Structure formats: C-alpha cells, structure tokens
C-alpha cells in the first residue's frame, strides 16, 4: 500500500511492503520529519552497499559525490526491531556518526540496559546512539499524515 505524507514541508510517498507494519512505515516518516532539518540530504531506505540497509540515512558526501573526511554516514536510522549485534556493528564498523533507533511504546529501561551491555561506551559516547520512543497512540496523533515537525509530546528522546 502506498502512503502519502507531508513531512517538514515535503511530499514523501512511502510503500508499505508485504509483511511490513504500518507502524514501521510511520516510524520512518516521523524519523524523517524529526531529522531532515538537521540532515537535509536525509533519504529513506537508500541502499548503501553494506550488509545492512538503513531505514533512514544521511551520507557524508562532498563535491562530486566523493566522501568527506570522518564518518561515512552522518546519520543512520533504524525503525522497529533491530538486533543488538547490528547496533554494535554499525557503531563499531559501519562508519556511522549518529545512530537513532525509533520505537513505539517500548520498555525503555530494558532496552537501555541491553544497548549499554551490547555497545561499548567508547562507541556510543558524544550522543552517537540515540533512542526515540514514540507514544503508543502516535498513529492516531499522526493520522492526518501532515507533519511539519514532530511535537515533543509524541516521543521521548534518550542519548544512550
């Protein structure tokens, strides 16, 4: 199914694939609306040539498409279920400057404990790992699919 969103003043069309929940599609849309101002070249589901494909990504590109010095990816967003192994790999080997995990109504203390055990402090320092936990009723709150900016009352943001 195809969904039309108006996100941060841009029309964004997202496909809900077979087996994909609407919640997953919505988290991609909300994550995009939250971070496109900070990362203007933010893309949704762009293949990047790694073993993993991001739900949201902002490449660190200079002129002519060549990578700039530093992290290969300014921003990488994962929505819904993600393994601790994947999170740790992305932060340690993936060239990710900032990794955001988007969830809906997840048990935050349990997830924070798992993340802190799976990812060494040096790989998550300086705000590199971020958890965004949306309210359980976020689908109702965003039903119009017109989101200029995501209200702070819709989520909790935690640096891990």
Describe these PLM feature segments.
Residues 56-58, 62-86:
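Conserved catalytic cores of phosphodiester-cleaving nucleases, focusing on short active-site segments
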Residues 74-75, 95-103, 126-129:
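Hydrophobic beta-strand segments of well-ordered beta-sheets in folded domains
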Residues 36, 67-74, 92-96:
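Flexible, charged surface loops at secondary-structure boundaries
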